[in-house]
Each structure stands twice: as C-alpha cells, then as structure tokens.
C-alpha cells in the first residue's frame, strides 16, 4: 500500500534551510509521459528543535503531564553544528533508496521538521513510502497570499508607545520574520537613517541577506537584517519567470512590502500618492527588526515546498515573531485539519519560542470559512477603522450618492452634463463588436465631440477586479476625450469583492453600491430627450457634480468585522465537524490600509509607480497583531508564545468607538445595511487592544506538551502524532479536547448534561483582588468559582467553570466570563457552546 497523501490546499507555513542539490539538470526532468512531481517527505527522526533542552520558566507548569516518549531523549542542546550531518544523512538515504535513479532534491528540512522536498515520479514516491524511516509523503501544493492612521485608531501614541518609551524605541530588539512576496529594500519605510538613535545589533540572529543583481550588496541595513528567497519548487516546474518574479528577495508584487511596513515600517514616512500627501505612515512596532523570507510570487503564487523552506530558515535564523498573510485554498484532508505539514512545523516553531500570527482568510462571511486552524497559531480576522475618504456625486435632482476615489472635485458650484459610454460611441463601434465598451478602456471606440466637457459614465465590472480592465486606463481614455471627469457605476456581478479607494488624476468617483448605481442610471435615462417621431436622442439632460475624495474624516463607527473576514467555528476536519478551539483569536484593522508599495509592482495598476498603496484583507490585519506582539515581546522578553497570545486575547475590546457592541457585516451585498452584533465566531475575543495587552494582569500558559496531549486526544491520531512529532501517545491516555487546553476561551462544540472546565491563570502584575462575573450562553446555566479571589505577583489561580444544558441550541450560542481587578485589570474569557439535551 502506497503511503502517499495527495494534498492540494493552497496555504502553507513551515520552515527549512535552503539546500539545493540535484543529481541531474532541469533539462533532464521528465519526458512528456512522465508523472514526476514535487513531494514533501518527512522522516521519523525528530528535527533539531525537538532535540533542544527545554528552557521553561521556573513558574511555568504544564496543565497536563502525559508520559510522552520522544524517540531521542537526549538532553544535549544541538545547534548549527548539527545541520551538516542532517543534510548528509538525507543525501545518503536518498542515494541508497533511489540508487542510480534521477531525482532532484530541492531542500533539506531539518530545524522544525526532518525531511526534504524532492522532484520524483510516482514509482519513486512509492519506493520511498515503503522505507521504515519515512513518516509521510505529501504532494507539493500551491499557496496564495490572503498604516498612516491605524496606530492612532489603536491608541498607540497615547498608550502602548508611551509605555515602551515612545515610538522612537517601540519594538526595538525584536525580530519579525515575514513569509510573503519579498520586500523593496529601497523604500524609506525600511531605511536605518535614524540620526537620533542607532539600531542595536541583534545578538540572537544568524540570518543573512542574499546578494543578487536586483538585490545588490547594501540592500539590507541595520533595520532590514535578513532577506532570502525560496523558489526551487517553481523553478523545477519550469514556471518561474525571473524577469517578473525576481530570483531574489526583491518584491515584484507589492504584498510583502505592504505587510512588512504595517507591522514594522519606520515612523513618520510621508504617504504621497498622485502628488497628494495623505499623512505620515508608521508601523505598529517601528523600531522592530525585519527579516524577509520570500516564498510567494506575482505570476504563480507559491508552493508548499518553498514556503516550508522559508519558515524553517526563519526559525533557524532566530526570529521572535512570524507573520504569515497566506491562507489555504481548501481544508487539509486526513484525520484532522491540524495534521498538515504547515501546522505541524509551526507547532515546532512555537516550541522554539516563536509567536506565529496568521491571517484568517478572506472567505467570509459564512460560518466555518476559517482558513487557520490550530490552537498554537494566533489567527487574525479583519475589521474596519474609523477613517473614511468620502467622495460623493450630487445629481441635478438634488440626490447625493456616496462613493469613493482619491480624486479632486469638479469646479465648485457648477454642474456638468453626463454621458454614458454607450451613448458616446463613434459610428464604427458597437456593443456587438466590443461587449466591454462600457468599461472605457479604448479611446478609439468613442466620439470626442460627444464626450468633451462632460462627465463620462463607465461600468465597473469584474474585469477590473481581475485586472483585465483598469481605472487608470479609463481615466487616460477620458482625458484623451477631453472629459471633465469619470463616474464608475458598479456591475451587480462585482458583489463579494472589496473595492478600495483609487487614486485619480482628474475628477472621478466609484459608486460601490448596486442600488446607488441604479439610482444614477435611472436619473440619467429619465433625463434623456428624444425626438417624438424617430426616438433618436436629441440631448442629454442629466447633470452632476463630483465632491472629490482626497480628505479623510474620522466619524465612522468602528471597528466592524468585515464581511470578507473568515468566520468560525473552527472546522476540525473536512466533514466540517466543529473543533473545540476558538477561531479567529481576535480582529485587527484590515480594511483600507495604507502601506508601503514596491517600486516594481504592477499588481495594482492604480498604484503602479507609487511608494504607497491602499489594500484590504486579513493579510493587512495579521501584521498589525505581529507588531503588537513585538511590543509585548519587547516589554516581556521571557513571555512564551502562549503568554503573548493570552495577553492579546484577554485584553481585547468588546465595544466600538461609540461605546456600543462591535458589529459585524453579515453579507457582501450592501454590507453596512446588514449589521449584527459580532460574536466570538466573527471576532474571537474582540478587537486588538495594544495598550492593555502590555499590562494584562493575568495570563494563561499553554505548553508544547499540552498541545501534544490535545493532538493525542483526536480519534485515530496516534500514528499521525508519532510521525509528525516523534512523540508516542500513551496507551492509557485520557482524551484531551480543545476545551481542556488552558486557553483564554472555552469552546464546546457539543455540550450535553453538565461539564466542568478549569483554567489556570498566573498573575504578572502586583497584588490584586478580582471579582468574577459572567453571562451564560443561550440554553446553558453557568457557575464560576471562585467569585472573588486575591492574588499576589507570580501566584496562580484556578478558575472552575461549570456549564449545564437547559435547552437545545441548533447553532453556537455565546457567553462571557469577566474578571475585574481592583487596580483596573480586566480579563475577558469568551464562552462558545452548542447545547444538546440528551434524548431519553
């Protein structure tokens, strides 16, 4: 039986060292009828990180104490000196197993997982799978990518930055690693030209900067301290385009440059787009170090084998935090979603002390759309903030239509006639010849005399979202036709896509609402005068004025959970059974975020050639949290990943800037017209609160051994746990569910009868007395003990929570436990339950 798992979900996170060894050249890859492919092979011997001696804090104690038996129980600490022997053992193993055969080894994985990536055929894969040393063979799979003002919205200038000593040192000494599309090293957001304070030398970092023609010597500096690229899987497949994708850490896409600047970009960088200053940018942790591991590319996305190599290298280099704005196309198959090369490698990264942040995914708002699964990964959803660049269109009938677009206004006090692109065609053009003429992409389709001096109405279709048509091209057409401005109305088929404000170098507006677009067209059509006999158009009577959208206002109710942000419950498997784990962990600003942009990016034509771009998605939310995590790590260097996670979660905000409960968008059609009170399935613990996270009061600790116990509690997981981690599940192991983990939340997918859950908390603040309050989920009675306790610094307190089913619930219901300290600390614990009364 061939032990080969076919896996095709499109996100991956793991780490490896870059070792390219080939027994033949790429020209010898395969014949036309060959079935060769890239496989990720993991071996049963543990990676280097599992050989490390545990260095736990004296006060740290695992809640669970299973009798775990690693294959190698050596207490000796292993470091870089171990790497050559691991790589040599891989080569020796392959030579013996595939003696005389052609194959390409792309990478050796050794730090977080023990294995390699190979380009082989199916017969060779089967031969490898029969070897007792092999744990898993997985087909390589594709992966994809998933501020000026947000630091102010998050309260950093008056809060967290003040606690750190000011923005001048916020995040200093902490290294954030980014697995993304690379970086533009010449961007001012990443220079080290701080004349007042030089950057310290990171003593715990061993990474390097690649030197290539497009990433020359000197690209890195005292802030950007590491940069590598990983593309061997793509190269082996023959799809790597070096002129477009750049065989270097240089960012040809823009996404990686953007995310890095959101987390750790320099403070006070002017955001100038289309010659207009939109403010001054800053990362959340502007003094943090940046190390870049490029594994995604503009033309094809990325592949698991390359991403795995990037993460393994990042861990080996010594990063403190990993930010991953990438998500899967589908849920991992197998026993549980947690058992995939990515999450297993990230579990090893957490064991090594790395805090891992991942985007939730942009597949909301339906339930169970979560793309980040495991409890050791901190999952971030996307929310709005209160800044809005308002633009509007005032019609001749005194109706005002809201819209968007970074555009200048039409002349004050003056109305201009409008003309639809379909009515502006020249005599040689028709819709029959070009069905896309309404998108205003070709100057030669139009009659300049008809358009000159008017507002040209164009259709914004799905082709704009796909990059087949562009705002920039439509504006160029309008200028060549001497139009006064451009109005874009939305095509109904664009529903479900987030549209960001776009720079316009003339008066213009995008109307993102279908209903508002209908209002515009109804007025326009009703104002057309026709000849009574011939029905030919005599004149266009509709007039309008564009207000312009260059100025921001800050009156928006925020935050709101964005409709596209992936939702819980967390799916445990491909049958969509619920895991007893809260996802997302929280939400952070992700909508309409200014960030640095690569000088070579053509990913967004509207921002091509600009130094900044506005983007939306959970990709933008995750680096906000990575930056806050860097601030926490700076204040508490001894904090483990789970402690950082706890500090972020228990301090999250539940109310918006108006003092009301945070709302969530329910649908992508007119999302702000379908708001409802956000639940933990939408926003996790709430909205990130950077200032409070630096002083959480009580923290919840969860160890690597706890996570292993959790994995061992999954039915049929014994062999998988052993193959991935090297730990054997005890024969008499008491099952541990997600709700048993010492997490700052309680999530029960099926609650029947009465169950009691315990949470252990450690006080990292001064002596304090806490009062405990709670609100039970629907269909459940709740009792929490103790209702009051006093605790000294360094002491632990166990909280006992008893839930009893009183009514059936067909879906998740939500409650909350609040701990209120007499010195001001507040600890929030969300409770999510599906209650089931057992049938008699």
Swiss-Prot record:
PA domain sequence ranges: 418-513
EC number in record: 3.4.21.-
Active site per database record: 180, 255, 619
Chief localization: secreted
Glycosylation (residues): 72, 193, 241, 398, 427, 480, 525, 553, 689, 715, 723, 767, 808
GO BP annotations listed: proteolysis
Positions of region (Disordered): 61-85
Prosegment location in residue numbers: 28-146
Pfam family, one: Peptidase_S8
Protein location: Secreted
Leader sequence segment: 1-27
Ranges of residues in domain Peptidase S8: 148-694
Gene Ontology, cellular component aspect: extracellular region
Family: Belongs to the peptidase S8 family.
Protein name: Subtilisin-like protease SBT2.3
